[in-house]
Amino acid sequence: MSTSHGYRASWWTNILHQVPHTNFQFEVVDNQFAPQEWPYQQALLFLASIAGLCLAISLILICVYLIRFCCCASQEDDDSKNHRVCCVTWSCVAAVIICCAGIGIGFYGNSETNDGVYQVTYSLMNTNHTLTSINLLVSDTVELLSSVVKSDLTQLEEIFSKRTEFLVMIRNTRRQVESVAQQLAEISFWKGTELNPNVLAEQVNFIEDYRWLAYILLLLLDLIICLFTLLGLAKRIKWLVIVMTVVSFFVLLLSWGSMGLEMATAVGLSDFCSNPDGYVMNQTQMITNINPDILQYYISCNQDVANPFRQRLTTSQRALSNIHSQLHGLEREAVPQFPTAEKNLLAVQGMLNTTEGNFHHLVALLNCRGLHKDYVDALKGLCYDGMEGILFLLLFSFLSALSFTAAVCSLPRAWKRFQNRDLDYDDMDEDDPFNPQESKRFVQWQSSI
């Protein structure tokens, strides 16, 4: 389980994490998230292939039903045919209604997934802003200290060259300034790493845009098929129902395929979300070679993990305090004797004030709470909203696949019974919900009221 403060794996994550992981040899595989390992990839592909098995079963059922329909249709009497037409029509309507309900679920799931991924990208950009601010603040402060050492402190050494006690104080100040610069330079832990959170956020956002668009198109396609199927049944347009039957068959393949992809994604994501800290720490350390203590500090952010920057920050703070004392002593004792040194001492004092302001800002940025909050927000977006959205998309694909399986079985029987619209409809079943005669009587009855 995750030890991150503020994040806890959800119950559906724990349930999916317990799904058996089996490779192609039907051997149990460890359910720890390891997408780079072939056995784990086999386990996810095996789960995705379950949808392929369901597709094969649905195709067999469709074939058996259509064969029976073709062979047994001629043996039915007229009353049985009319009754069956009514049942088939209602079956098609029920399948379309279920599909429409699935489409609504799909739109919600797609939106939830998009919200979760957006939260991840937003957190990555915040993380990049914090890390960039640390690097810029450190580099600016180190550059400022170096410039003071090269200019003002060097000039002060020349001015106090004949006074040993003042020269010793200036050289001590110089060593402490150089020590502060060195300590701060070592704090910039993310500088020069190959992992850029902003680039990663752009890549994730790019992939998510196409994923979101693909699902929107699939949902709209399903909705259009449902509407045109109802139109064809209501108006008894044979060619339209035939076209919708063919299109429904291809969408049936897409539905089972998307279900397999969503099933593998949901299980893989649950494996990650059940214990994200270990995977994130190992991968980040492998790519960036950052000290594991630093990564553990920001990932855990609790009292049990010491601040890895504490010693450097404490040393720098003491050095800045000593520099303050020495500068005050020089202003009090040296300036009356060396008036030309006042300008350089004021410049060093201004540098010291700026450095202390940057130092306090740097301490706030280095605190684990900011980066840890971004990390937890990313986990919540991915493992709460993202996981919930994928599960709703999985339900949509399942309902869509079942609905189109029923439609492909039922629509051929419906279009075969359609009569030419110019013929007499007296022999039609009065209980048929799309009987044109019944609709005509209803319109006449309304006009007479």
From Swiss-Prot:
Cytoplasmic side: 65-86, 234-238, 410-449
Ranges of the Extracellular topological domain: 1-43, 108-212, 260-388
Catalysed conversion reaction: chloride(in) = chloride(out); L-glutamate(out) = L-glutamate(in)
Disulfide partners: C273-C383, C301-C368
Pfam families cross-referenced by the UniProt entry: Tweety
Entry annotated with the keyword Disulfide bond: yes
Site (Essential for the formation of the channel-pore): residue numbering on this chain: R163
Its membrane topology: Multi-pass membrane protein
Domain of life of the native organism: Eukaryota
Transmembrane portions of the chain: 44-64, 87-107, 213-233, 239-259, 389-409
Subunit structure: Homotetramer; disulfide-linked. Homodimer.
Name of the molecule in the record: Protein tweety homolog 1-A
Source organism: Xenopus laevis
